[in-house]
Amino acid sequence: MANVALIGATGMVGSHILTSLLENPAVARVDTISRRTPSAAAAAPQTQLTTFVSDDTSRWAAQLSSLTPTPSIFISAFGTTRAAAGGFENQYKVEHGLNVEMARAARDAGTKVYVLISSGGANKASSFAYPRMKGEIEEDVKALGFERTVILRPGLISGQRQESRPAEAAFRFIAGIAGKVHSGLKDGWAQDADVIARAAVNAGLKALDGDVPPGSEKLWILGGSDIIKYGGKK
């Protein structure tokens, strides 16, 4: 049975990850750390889910370090937007800084498996700021040396966000129409949030058991087709 810590539990993918974790019989306990109380917390028993809620993110790493038992898996679906952060410089400080800080705290606490929701375009050498930031997060957490690191690189994420992102919403609408015509028209470039979430949970549990593809013993990267494969309903 796995103990799992999760940040980003109130976001579009993270909320589905939390639901998937709570429904999975292989997960004994879930600890979330967030700015707001996750919606799933109201129905979950305290023996299964513990939430730590604080706007002061400087307290998050200490909270993660204090968890007992130590999480065997740490999942990050944490992210923010340029608009919410007040510009890209602040977005980078929050998203890159907190992701790496929390990953380091998990590693130091003895967590074995780290799972990151990244982006399909992540590339530390990109000339564009957002994919470069995502690539730098990947590189910095890989350097921490977890027993196993799992990185998911979804394309466009389909689903309903709480915050407004007009351009992205237009593409999500197109993805929804394409998916209704035939799933193959969408799966290569867009994945549903709940599918990404199940893939993250299933891949994390498989990594904990050592059940990973050959050559992925230390680092397992899942692209769009892998996310569809591991995120399908059984």
Curated annotation (Swiss-Prot):
A GO CC term assigned to this protein in UniProt: mitochondrial outer membrane
Coiled-coil intervals: none
Keyword field: Membrane, Mitochondrion, Mitochondrion outer membrane, Transit peptide
Any Pfam family matching the protein: Epimerase
A biological-process GO annotation: import into nucleus
SUPFAM superfamilies in alphabetical order: NAD(P)-binding Rossmann-fold domains
Membrane topology qualifier: Peripheral membrane protein
Annotated InterPro entries: Epimerase_deHydtase (IPR001509), NAD(P)-bd_dom_sf (IPR036291)
Compartments it resides in: Mitochondrion outer membrane
Similarity comment text for this entry: Belongs to the FMP52 family.
Protein name from the UniProt record: Protein fmp52-1, mitochondrial
Provenance organism: Neosartorya fischeri (strain ATCC 1020 / DSM 3700 / CBS 544.65 / FGSC A1164 / JCM 1740 / NRRL 181 / WB 181)
Gene: fmp521
